Amino acid sequence: MKLINLTKHQVNLFTNGEIISIPPADCDPIRITTHQREISRVDGIPVMQTVYSQSEVTGGRLPDPKPNTMYIVSSLVCMAYSDRRDLVSPNTHPDATVRDGMGNLMGVTSLQSFYRRN
């Protein structure tokens, strides 16, 4: 399986005692525009719904799916395109991160998917 990093950051995967570094591809990173709208109030405090818009992608273009290829994108892009099985993002869940002594993120131990069958 080929991994192509469409983020602007190098992705470091800590797995099986080694570090796999995946540099960004030579393209503009893909960004998703978000919108918020108030859906209710709790004791006068607004409760906002965040909506991710596939129609308002900025930066680079999301490639079409290819056999044996996974694309690393931001979690927001991954969530907005939850119909795409070929999109993954670095798993930044606290149980999946590797940090240095100062708490800085060095990498992750896995990737995550937000794929949902429609």
Q: Where are the regions that the model predicts?
A:
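Intrinsically disordered, low-complexity segments enriched in small/polar residues
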Residues: 2, 6-118
